[in-house]
Amino acid sequence: MRKYILLLALSFLMSAAGFTASAQNAVKVKGVVTSQDDGLPLIGVAVMAGPGNGVLTSLDGDYEIEVPAGTELIFSCIGFEEKRVMITEDGPAILDVVLKTESLKIEDAVVIAYGVRKKGTVAGSVATVKADKLKDTPTPAFDQALQGQVAGLTVLSSTGEPSASATMVIRGVNSINSGTAPLYIVDGVAISASDFNTINPSDIESMSVLKDASSTSIYGARAANGVIVITTRRGREDKPSVSYKGQMGVSSIAYGNWDLMNTAQRIQYEKEIGLSDGQNYDYLSKTDVNWLDAVFNDRAMLQSHEISVAGASDKTNYFISGGYYNQDGIAPGSSFERFSLRYNFEQKLTKKLSVGINTNFNFQNIQQADEGSYTLVTPISAARFMLPYWNPFKSDGSLASINDGSWKGQGQNPLEWLENNPLKYKKYKALSVGFVEWKPISNLTLRSQASMDFSHTTGFSQSYPSYAPNLGEGSAARSSSDTHNLQISNTINYRFNIGDSHEFNFLLGQEGETYHTEGFSVTGRGQTNDLLTDISFATRVTAWSSFADADYSRMSFFGRAEYSYSDRYYAELSLRSDGSSRFGKNNRWGTFGAVGFMWNIRNEEWAAGLRDVLSTAQLAFSSGTSGNSSIPNYEHLPLIGSTGNYLGDSAVAPIQPGNENLSWENAWTTNLALHLGLFSRINVDFELYNKRTSDMLMSVPLSYAASNGFGYKWDNVGAMVNRGVELNVNAYLIELKDFSWNLNFNAGYNRNKITELYNGVTEYERANTNTKLVVGHPLGEFYLNRFAGVNPANGDALWYDKDGELTNEFRAEDKVMTGKSFYAPWQGGFGTALRYRRLSLSAQFSWVADRWMINNDRYFDESNGRFATYNQSSRLLERWKEPGDVTDIPRHGIYTEFDSRLLEDASFLRLKNLMLAYDFSHFRLYIQGQNLLTFTKFSGLDPEGASNIYSAQYPMARQYTLGL
């Protein structure tokens, strides 16, 4: 590399010599250029005295140039601040220059893969979310704060349970069976979505969403679904600063659409359908319980306290924070408590050698409410079934109990059941990243980084013997799991410039990862005392299992080359080769690469007259590949496993056929982007993309004869396309000393289409999902019978058959593709921020459109007789009752089926955050609301489900928070 630089430098010097200015008052200047950081000589510094007169510094940082008196010498080098010195007739003859490292302001820095770049110099598609979008959000994790912030990033919560993470998708779903989540990188280390709540949002400095191949390809086989890069805070002040942040809040259900019968309606319904025999309605009518209010807490408390210390000097940089977060769930039996400690430290040992460590410790107490399944005892589900004249409380406010007969309903009181069957988890988490960085010569950086990610999770459930249904015999279960992930990376980065126009940056790297997990669970029964309901007091063990040890390893080599010319033309090339233990020996390695180009139109000479108008004008193009390896660890191997026991002896049998030819899933992405800035006030980003997934990793159904009894086998089959457009607008409409006003808007449209399945198959119905995979159709499209209404003459339900003719028979063969998918093609957000002196007001909305879900709750609530002994929707009072009635609910006894009647528009617009704040001299006081308003046609408790079927879901919470 040095020889290459020397040759270029010599050629530059030779050409420059021919154009060196000559005059009677010429001054010869020479000297050495060094770095302020380490005192080392700088190679390749451009020393310019005007057009055609310039030299480059040598390997020792030396330069010599002859210039006319009165000339301004300009010293410039990539990564350093430019320096200018005026040369007079009196000299100086010897001019040694020290260049200061160019420091990026936080707002001008863009975090990319394995580095940081200045805003406006990146060819790839990268969206940045800064800390001010996260720091005051009253959530245990950062994921909720991203909703509606980035075009092309869909964030949906599958549950409102406090410890749960959201589901994120970047530019559409790219695979049918393998993983669809982005790769999450925190301080250079990959984490899983389950660890979101281990990161205090206030510890985050910035997040970058990498969307195209140019920005993600260097992550190779893990980046097909995009990458989210998270950087935690560092000390940036010269002297130590101490800060405190506290929040107190209250939560309630955010949407809560509830149409189940009250007592008067229930009594009317029972009389109409013949369930009134033996009922004392005079007595029952005195009780009217809204089970939504009985089960869900409208005053669930939240509190958060954080203290941090940060500072920096020439040699030391540190950030230390400690936090406590406690949130009660709005559903009973759910809560989240976290203790966190972060320590980020960097130390410059010598001028050339630096070390650092980023460590995060975390302890959590978690209670999770059962959801997603229909039972008569778990409160979220049971609330829909309980009759309104069954009171879960006694007159004194205590729980009505099956033990003393105060519970008058059928079965068990769900709230009492929960109190007698607690389930708790504890999680211990440690993530530590250490690095050594060496700069043997100027502009050359060698870095080695190692990380250890360890978690230990325990679960403990009890069922007390004093609870009457247990008949005096308790039970207890404990589970334990351990996971550790070791990662190491080594990189070499060299950057230099030739003259003042050509800038180069080269990166070479190697990474390795090893992952291991193991665990067990055991259940014991026979305890006779509530206080002793534990495994050690069981009289017998009734269930046990040892989770099979799971291991995974990965090895990678990668590189990136960047070039820019005169701040006008930028080019990037990246390449990565990955080897994974998840694939067979025939296809263990995969190679991925990408190119990117960016044209900075504003810096063209012919655009000089437009610069007052165009603060930014850039055109970018990228194309390349990335991969997906998100499948179980051993699918390429034929496996045997336990099949239970026979006469007290254990037994094993083949459980998986294996596939040694299993290989990587590939995604080829092409991206075209236009970035415009107008009057330094309005910024517009417009992007088009096309992503094609091939060799999809799918669990392929096998015929019995071909599979030797195995039903499925993983294979590389099928293809899928995602095409879309994104728009992001940020406008600083007013920027005055005492008043400012900002508007932001983003929207993304993604069209998904399956282009190939497996073995010539063009369609395949997915069991228990009401969806079907069909070539030419989008993933997630519903496959249902079409409900046609009710025959007003006799009250029969009507459907359309496959040919569009009316029928009163519900037949599976009449299902059709509906043209409606669970995956929303449209998503986005918009917001505004106003400031008057020290008072500020901000609002942020998020939305998705053309998204559909099956409302499974209605299958039970509107059963029309199938589940009539339990509470039903008040809509059943509007069912068909006599000839001539026009309604969409059939006569009693015509049961509800899974048809298009249950398919609902789950599009929504949500006021995600509203904040009013006042900045005092040394602190900031604010009040804010989360999920304050929801606009939707969906009839369930919440439209934000992350599944194609909505069933007994834990709804999102509305929060009011006071913060300091």
Residue ranges and their predicted role:
Residues 1-12, 16-343, 347-362, 404, ...:
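Short, small/polar-rich motifs associated with maturation and membrane association
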Residues 33, 99, 436, 494, ...:
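Hydrophobic beta-strand positions in extracellular immunoglobulin-like domains
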Residues 105, 120, 236-289, 330-334, ...:
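Surface-exposed loop/interface segments of Gram-negative outer-membrane beta-barrel transport/assembly proteins
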Residues 204, 341-343, 448, 488, ...:
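Extended, hydrophobic alpha-helical segments in both membrane/secreted and soluble proteins
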Residues 232, 307-311, 341-347, 432-438, ...:
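Residues on the lipid-exposed face of transmembrane beta-strands in outer-membrane beta-barrel proteins
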Residues 246, 322-328, 571-580, 621-623, ...:
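Transmembrane beta-strand segments that form the barrel wall of outer-membrane beta-barrel proteins
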Residues 315-318, 352-355, 443-446, 568-571, ...:
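Repeated loop/turn-to-beta-strand initiation elements of outer-membrane beta-barrel proteins
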Residues 822-854:
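Glycine-rich, aromatic-lined ligand/substrate-binding cores of catalytic
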